[in-house]
């Protein structure tokens, strides 16, 4: 498929919200509009002058959805979001026995099986927790429901920073007493006990699906570091296998122990958030530098054995947790060493330099070399680059950047995709170094209101409809086109296809499933759709 450039931001034209049938569908297929059912509430749109709208939520109202609908055999569900203001609106269609369309044909190839999906989610940073808890309790609950419940978009991944990061309001670790090599003074501060942990428990209670927790450290205690500071160029003192590295490895176990005391178990930890950052002079916020060779030896001699010999031996270890530009080199260094490789379950990647690193040459090549090591996208956000505005309320372009990234990652063997902060304030913070960025949910505490951005719904087109255990399958286009598309099978054998149109042109479209027939539809300009149907 060919990828078109993202559109220039323009102010939206108001759209009616009564029927979801686009006028351009006439003559192809009349998709039957589905009225808002008892559990579903429509978006209350608000424009801030960017290319689309946000949906406004407060203590008494928030848009919501019914659980995903799999209609009777021979029909399909279609969920639509558009730049003009539709937000995951449901319609139903009939699967045709014969192909009558003349446009693009996407053919499902269920016999071509690829990776199984782990899931989708976001990070419970200190900043996210502060913003959520600044709302009134009813508004807090609606925000958490929006992300984690069946009424929302069904997140099943939460990334948790181990101690502070830039999205904290102070710098701290869990062991700031100098030379405490036995970690006797290791303790969780109120950021964990009063903010993150209670919110994570509330999210787990709301979720219908099992939620997996992923932990990542930004910096070690400063007394373990060569530069004696949380930020800037610095790595662990000494060499792998020594007291500094062993202490840092045991810090991971102490963290897992402490959260277990609060009845929270982790699916995975990453060896270090962005290990390349701590190799850069003047790096502005929390970091800990590792070269690939240093990470290899730390995993082989310290972190891997320490986790394996602890009560947390089932916790998965993910390497890298940095830009995919570093692949496949970083993977080659670590995974060609059998002592390190035996402890590594997966490779975590961040999205920030993706424009410099084609997916095929990085993700694709890494999968070719190490097909049994999973790839997992662990962090993404927009607004972080110096030329970008931090927050653009209602930006459709930023939503398209998310869904384009998710589809590309899925097409190159990645098993999950994790957003950064679950919620930020209108400035894009708080952040102790003022590294403000955007978020799918922006909280305005002055109004006890939060805004669900296009990014939220673009993510929802995947997270709500692709449960853990779904498997990507083949999908072949009949001609070059400007759409991004991916197909998956649910564990029960039903099908899901997500189609993103980043161009201004409407694209007539047929999806062919050899088992059931043809789905005649259209992909309007600047839209994203999720299609669901039963195959038996």
Swiss-Prot record:
<feature type="glycosylation site" description="N-linked (GlcNAc...) asparagine">
    <location>
        <position position="309"/>
    </location>
</feature>
<comment type="pathway">
    <text>Sphingolipid metabolism.</text>
</comment>
<dbReference type="GO" id="GO:0004348">
    <property type="term" value="F:glucosylceramidase activity"/>
</dbReference>
<feature type="glycosylation site" description="N-linked (GlcNAc...) asparagine">
    <location>
        <position position="501"/>
    </location>
</feature>
<protein>
    <recommendedName>
        <fullName>Lysosomal acid glucosylceramidase</fullName>
        <ecNumber>3.2.1.45</ecNumber>
        <ecNumber>2.4.1.-</ecNumber>
        <ecNumber>3.2.1.-</ecNumber>
        <ecNumber>3.2.1.46</ecNumber>
    </recommendedName>
</protein>
<feature type="disulfide bond">
    <location>
        <begin position="43"/>
        <end position="55"/>
    </location>
</feature>
<keyword id="KW-1207">Sterol metabolism</keyword>
<keyword id="KW-0753">Steroid metabolism</keyword>
<dbReference type="Pfam" id="PF02055">
    <property type="entry name" value="Glyco_hydro_30"/>
</dbReference>
<dbReference type="GO" id="GO:0046512">
    <property type="term" value="P:sphingosine biosynthetic process"/>
</dbReference>
<dbReference type="GO" id="GO:0050295">
    <property type="term" value="F:steryl-beta-glucosidase activity"/>
</dbReference>
<keyword id="KW-0458">Lysosome</keyword>
<dbReference type="InterPro" id="IPR033453">
    <property type="entry name" value="Glyco_hydro_30_TIM-barrel"/>
</dbReference>
<feature type="signal peptide">
    <location>
        <begin position="1"/>
        <end position="39"/>
    </location>
</feature>
<keyword id="KW-0328">Glycosyltransferase</keyword>
<keyword id="KW-1015">Disulfide bond</keyword>
<dbReference type="GO" id="GO:0030259">
    <property type="term" value="P:lipid glycosylation"/>
</dbReference>
<dbReference type="GO" id="GO:1904457">
    <property type="term" value="P:positive regulation of neuronal action potential"/>
</dbReference>
<dbReference type="GO" id="GO:0005783">
    <property type="term" value="C:endoplasmic reticulum"/>
</dbReference>
<comment type="function">
    <text>Glucosylceramidase that catalyzes, within the lysosomal compartment, the hydrolysis of glucosylceramides/GlcCers (such as beta-D-glucosyl-(1&lt;-&gt;1')-N-acylsphing-4-enine) into free ceramides (such as N-acylsphing-4-enine) and glucose. Plays a central role in the degradation of complex lipids and the turnover of cellular membranes. Through the production of ceramides, participates in the PKC-activated salvage pathway of ceramide formation. Catalyzes the glucosylation of cholesterol, through a transglucosylation reaction where glucose is transferred from GlcCer to cholesterol.</text>
</comment>
<keyword id="KW-0472">Membrane</keyword>
<dbReference type="GO" id="GO:0023021">
    <property type="term" value="P:termination of signal transduction"/>
</dbReference>
<keyword id="KW-0732">Signal</keyword>
<dbReference type="GO" id="GO:0005794">
    <property type="term" value="C:Golgi apparatus"/>
</dbReference>
<dbReference type="GO" id="GO:0005765">
    <property type="term" value="C:lysosomal membrane"/>
</dbReference>
<dbReference type="GO" id="GO:0032715">
    <property type="term" value="P:negative regulation of interleukin-6 production"/>
</dbReference>
<dbReference type="GO" id="GO:0006680">
    <property type="term" value="P:glucosylceramide catabolic process"/>
</dbReference>
<dbReference type="InterPro" id="IPR017853">
    <property type="entry name" value="Glycoside_hydrolase_SF"/>
</dbReference>
<comment type="subunit">
    <text>Interacts with saposin-C. Interacts with SCARB2. Interacts with TCP1. Interacts with GRN; this interaction prevents aggregation of GBA1-SCARB2 complex via interaction with HSPA1A upon stress.</text>
</comment>
<dbReference type="GO" id="GO:0006914">
    <property type="term" value="P:autophagy"/>
</dbReference>
<feature type="disulfide bond">
    <location>
        <begin position="57"/>
        <end position="62"/>
    </location>
</feature>
<dbReference type="GO" id="GO:0043409">
    <property type="term" value="P:negative regulation of MAPK cascade"/>
</dbReference>
<dbReference type="GO" id="GO:0071356">
    <property type="term" value="P:cellular response to tumor necrosis factor"/>
</dbReference>
<feature type="glycosylation site" description="N-linked (GlcNAc...) asparagine">
    <location>
        <position position="98"/>
    </location>
</feature>
<feature type="active site" description="Proton donor">
    <location>
        <position position="274"/>
    </location>
</feature>
<dbReference type="GO" id="GO:0004336">
    <property type="term" value="F:galactosylceramidase activity"/>
</dbReference>
<dbReference type="GO" id="GO:0005764">
    <property type="term" value="C:lysosome"/>
</dbReference>
<dbReference type="GO" id="GO:0005802">
    <property type="term" value="C:trans-Golgi network"/>
</dbReference>
<keyword id="KW-0443">Lipid metabolism</keyword>
<keyword id="KW-0378">Hydrolase</keyword>
<dbReference type="InterPro" id="IPR001139">
    <property type="entry name" value="Glyco_hydro_30"/>
</dbReference>
<dbReference type="GO" id="GO:0050728">
    <property type="term" value="P:negative regulation of inflammatory response"/>
</dbReference>
